[in-house]
């Protein structure tokens, strides 16, 4: 039976006046009619959205005096960047002019590589594949500050749980135009996330708070809550996620993560969107089909813009 249909059928059965053996077929038919799965992930879209709204986190950011790199939303950012193609050892090429990237054209671009004497070859790459040669670049540093708080948006991805049999994983992805990290690993663009895992009935089971290349899973008692919304403390600069105020060790000797009270409180349930799946985006969120980088290419991978959520390993795991 399709995920979410049993819960819907149970609800309809409880509302029915007649015996189950007389109305079972009619109830099942009604449940099928109400069951919608536009992104073909095997979960009813309405049930996905119900869980997404219920567990959308409250994100507490560091004070402005400590961290100036604030969140944004995809459309705000696309209106302030151009798309370029990195030719190693040769001049980069512009693919989309400043302010012309959109959700509809981001993943439909193609560009030929360069060979001897930096001439274009017959080898063509496409922006809907995992190609880090494509990258988005702001014209100046002003974009790094992020959008006004009224425009911050969280991007939701739901899937069948990788941890709990019959359960669900609800991912909440946050976008920042800049990662002002420690040492010399600053880079443009930053996609961070947490994942709330539920049981088959949609009850909270645990939450994964991503931090750098890893993360930690927490039980309900280890988290702070605002009603049904888990509270997330975002590290200044790098935006890693932790459950409390404090100092946290990292894998880099001599550098720690710090979280604070006293900064903006981002209640993500006020502005979120379910993006669906890469092969079938929901709510016109076609940006998830773009496989290039979201920021400028630096000297190393660590100082270069990251790829989007659906091209990161955690998309199908945590």
Question: What residue spans do the PLM features occupy?
Answer:
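Exposed boundary/loop context
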Residues: 10-11, 35
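C-terminal motif of bacterial Sec signal peptides marking the signal peptidase cleavage site
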Residues: 14-16
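Short beta-strand micro-motifs enriched in acidic
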Residues: 197-201
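A domain-level signal for the mature, folded cores of soluble proteins
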Residues: 35-192, 202-318
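Bacterial signal peptide processing site
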Residues: 18-20
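Sec-dependent signal peptide recognition
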Residues: 2-9
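Fibrous stalk/shaft segments of extracellular and virion attachment machinery
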Residues: 28-34
């Amino acid at each position: 039976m399709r995920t979410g249909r049993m819960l819907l059928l149970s609800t309809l059965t409880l509302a029915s006046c007649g015996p189950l053996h007389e109305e079972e077929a009619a109830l099942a038919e009604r449940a099928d009619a109400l069951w919608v799965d536009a992104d073909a992930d095997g979960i009813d879209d309405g049930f996905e959205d119900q869980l997404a709204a219920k567990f959308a986190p409250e994100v507490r950011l560091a004070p402005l005096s400590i961290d100036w790199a604030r969140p944004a939303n995809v459309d705000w950012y696309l209106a302030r960047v151009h798309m370029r193609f990195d030719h190693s050892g040769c001049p980069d090429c512009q693919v989309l002019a400043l302010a012309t990237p959109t959700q509809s054209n981001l993943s439909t671009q193609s560009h030929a590589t360069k060979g001897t004497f930096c001439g274009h070859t017959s080898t063509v790459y496409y922006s809907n594949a995992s190609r880090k040669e494509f990258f988005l670049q702001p014209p100046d540093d002003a974009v790094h500050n992020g959008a006004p708080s009224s425009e911050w948006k969280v991007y939701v991805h739901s899937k069948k749980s990788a941890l709990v049999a019959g359960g669900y994983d609800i991912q909440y992805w946050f976008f920042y135009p800049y990662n002002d990290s420690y040492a010399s690993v600053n880079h443009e663009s930053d996609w961070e996330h947490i994942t709330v895992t539920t049981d088959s009935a949609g009850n909270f089971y645990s939450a994964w708070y991503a931090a750098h290349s890893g993360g930690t899973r927490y039980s309900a008692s280890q988290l702070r809550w605002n009603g049904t919304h888990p509270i997330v403390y975002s590290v200044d600069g790098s935006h890693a996620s932790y459950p409390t105020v404090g100092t946290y060790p990292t894998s880099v000797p001599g550098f720690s993560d710090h979280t604070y009270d006293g900064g903006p409180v981002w209640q993500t349930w006020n502005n979120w969107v379910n993006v669906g799946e890469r092969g079938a985006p929901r709510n016109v969120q076609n940006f998830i089909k773009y496989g290039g980088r979201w920021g400028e290419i630096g000297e190393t991978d660590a100082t270069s813009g990251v790829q989007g959520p659906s091209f990161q390993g955690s998309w199908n795991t945590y």
